[in-house]
Regions:
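Universal eukaryotic N-terminal targeting presequences
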Residues: 1-2, 16
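Sec-dependent N-terminal signal peptides
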Residues: 3-12
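Asp-box/BNR beta-propeller blade signature and adjacent active/binding-site loops
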Residues: 14-389
Length: 389
């Protein structure tokens, strides 16, 4: 592998000083590379993955690729295959380390080249520290069976919120289509897709955020037995709330921030669960713009929240990092990992966020410019976000 491309100079290397670095995980290329995820391994290595191929759902050559950054190194290792379902596109991978230090890879295999037919898959590994490529020791599919309460919740939610003026023309036909589709047991069991890291509650419960392009809503897969069995939460209903990112407040409430796949004004959507992910409030607009693009929110070790997002209504040409000191009531500080003119042809999208054991924040995202496409890795600390320079 070539040396990583250092795009920004190191501004400081100790706590209390601003720090930002950016690297390309691999050289720019013509292939479509997108939807990355990053995780820190127990030994301090970083592992990243993304999907790679000639397209997305309609390209059967798409597979999951990965790379490892060993602790203390400034160069990502050789790219390797992580998952490939023969003759089907594999997309939207998510990496996660559970409380037992088991490595999980969640992703979707797209059947019939349609998002709404996607199959939710996972594989796990306990042998991944001393090898470049994880040795996977288990693989299965996750099949959720939302019951009649699923359709009842959707219908009730739309009936309660249908009269809001901003939805006057759009919502009635939209909501009727969703309500009717929700009554079909077969449709309810397929098409649930990954995008953002799961979270683990103090009880050990795992919450895996999912969404459906068919229903244009979200849901959470819940496991209370370390991922051996999964069941569906009540749906997160709204006008296009998809790709949820979950974060838990000090009072136990869980907030889902979501991409806006609905009507204007384009805003990040927000829903709250007060019962550990079982049920969710109707998704509402926040003040933060969103051009129908993925986001991620992360709770830092000190309790502050960080959000990575495209903060425009129509372009993915800038990637903002927002900081909240009050659990998302307001986002007081903003800094840009990259900011370009809307018509520049440069896109920065689909962030994945973690905080490593040394306190640094790691971000991977899709970068496209005139050189081609790559997955970018940015490293920064909270002081960099706070620094106005």
């Amino acid at each position: 592998m070539k040396k990583l491309l250092l795009l920004s100079l190191l501004l400081g290397i100790t706590n209390g000083k601003p720090l930002v670095q950016q690297y390309s995980i691999f050289p720019f290329q013509d292939k479509h590379v997108h939807g990355s995820s990053i995780v820190e391994l127990p030994n301090g290595d970083l592992l990243s993955c993304w999907f790679h191929g000639s397209g997305e759902r309609k390209a059967n050559d798409v597979r999951i690729k990965g790379s490892r950054l060993k602790k203390g190194s400034n160069e990502w290792g050789a790219v390797f295959d992580m998952a490939d379902t023969p003759n089907l596109p594999d997309c939207n991978p998510v990496l996660w380390i559970d409380n037992n230090e088991k490595l999980w890879l969640f992703w979707i295999a797209v059947r019939a080249n349609q998002w709404e037919n996607s199959m939710l898959r996972y594989r796990t590994s306990t042998d991944y520290l001393n090898k470049e490529t994880p040795a996977w020791n288990w693989q299965d599919n996750i099949i959720l069976k939302p019951g009649e309460r699923f359709s009842e919740t959707i219908q009730l939610a739309f009936e309660e919120h249908i009269d809001e003026p901003m939805w006057a023309e759009y919502a009635p036909p939209y909501s009727r289509l969703i309500i009717d589709a929700a009554k079909d047991p077969e449709k309810r069991q397929k098409g649930w897709m990954t995008r953002i890291h799961p979270i683990s509650l103090k009880s050990g419960r795992i919450l895996l955020p999912l969404y459906s392009d068919g229903y244009n809503i979200s849901i959470v897969a819940i496991s209370d037995d370390n991922g051996n069995n999964w069941r569906a939460s009540n749906p997160i209903v709204g006008l296009g709330p998809i790709q949820p990112s979950l974060v838990q407040k000090q009072n136990g409430h869980i907030v889902a921030y979501m991409r806006d796949s609905g009507i204007e004004p384009k805003r990040i959507l927000k829903s709250i669960s007060k019962d550990n992910g079982e049920t969710w409030s109707f998704a509402k607009d926040t003040k933060t713009p969103n051009p129908s693009s993925s986001i991620e929110v992360l709770q830092l070790k000190n309790g502050n929240w960080v959000m990575a997002c495209n903060d425009t209504e129509s372009s993915r040409s800038q990637m903002a990092i927002l900081l909240s000191f009050n659990e998302g009531k307001s986002w007081e500080v903003k800094k840009y990992i990259g900011k370009h003119e809307h018509n520049s042809g440069i896109t920065l999208a689909y962030p994945s966020l973690i905080q490593s054991s040394d306190g640094l924040i790691h971000l991977t995202y899709s970068l496209k410019n005139k050189k081609g496409k790559t997955i970018q890795h940015a490293i920064f600390n909270e002081d960099w976000i706070k620094n106005n320079r």
